[in-house]
């Protein structure tokens, strides 16, 4: 029951973020904060042993995107950074494939825009929140399996 509640909570946050980021090009702190409170409220009492992994995943995902925001200021906003951290809280280690999917999808969309509209498309800004949300959904349903496959194939 708690797993379903956690999945629904994350899916709701990702939907709200996608709609808002596409419409206003901002990821509101209120959505992210509410998502964090709900996520912790579900996980802490039902699966407290997973909290260190989830905290590490949140710090790792948020820190990774923070590097992009700091070194490439126009490319990534702080809302994206905070969303990645929130996804780490919900997904744990499955946030790694979620971010990989998000970056791949965003890159393919950018490439498609450049191929379709030429150099002019390089000056456009495309919100990254919807790509993070898509990656989050993949992470939600297949993230652990993708993580295990990657480790077994390339590391072990």
Give short role names for the model-derived ranges.
Residues 1-4:
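Transmembrane helix-loop-helix
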């Amino acid at each position: 029951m708690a797993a379903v509640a956690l999945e629904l909570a994350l899916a709701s946050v990702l939907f709200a973020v996608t709609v808002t980021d596409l419409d206003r090009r901002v990821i509101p702190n209120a959505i992210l904060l509410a998502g964090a409170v709900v996520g912790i409220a579900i996980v802490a009492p039902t699966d407290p042993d997973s909290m260190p992994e989830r905290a590490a995943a949140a710090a790792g995902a948020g820190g990774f995107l923070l590097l992009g925001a700091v070194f490439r200021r126009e490319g990534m906003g702080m809302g994206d950074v905070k969303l990645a951290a929130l996804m780490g809280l919900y997904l744990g280690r499955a946030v790694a494939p979620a971010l990989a999917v998000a970056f791949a999808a965003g890159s393919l969309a950018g490439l498609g825009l450049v191929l379709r509209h030429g150099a002019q498309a390089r000056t456009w800004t495309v919100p990254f929140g919807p790509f993070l949300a898509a990656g989050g959904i993949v992470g939600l349903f297949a993230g652990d399996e993708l993580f295990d496959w990657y480790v077994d194939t390339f590391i072990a």
